[in-house]
Amino acid sequence: MAENRSQSRMHVVWNGAIRLPTLHIVQVKVLNLTDAGMQFSCSENLRIGQKYEMQIHVPDLNGGPNTTVVPCFAECLYVILSGREFRVGAKFSGLSPKNNELLLKWSERCARGVA
């Protein structure tokens, strides 16, 4: 089945964290990204339409040991229960130009099959 999206998904396994409205921090696992958003797994059932403060730990493009912490906001678009976790689809906002460029470089790299 063909995907109906402007940008194909970039499959990743990156760590991240999300701040709940209660100010509790929950660890997440980013599963895939596009230029507009992402899917991640989370132990909490997030609220559709809610905007959450988030951080994504993006690996070094050259395979080095360092990661870049990318702060952003994620607006919850859907939540699907998958086993003991929830799969969450979210739209990005609040990315700095520098961090947006980093994610675009990763996307280009994955499109070339290098990742």
Give the location of each predicted region:
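C-terminal output/interaction extensions
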Residues: G83-A115
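Short, conserved beta-turn/loop elements at beta-strand boundaries and strand-helix junctions
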Residues: D35, V79-R84
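Short, charged beta-turn/beta-strand-edge "cap" motif at the junction between a beta-strand
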Residues: H57-N62
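Short coil-to-beta-strand transition motifs
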Residues: M10-H11, T22-I25, G63-F73
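Short beta-strand-centered aromatic/proline hotspots
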Residues: Q27-V30, C72-Y78
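N-terminal helix initiation/capping motif
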Residues: M1-L33, S43, L104-A115
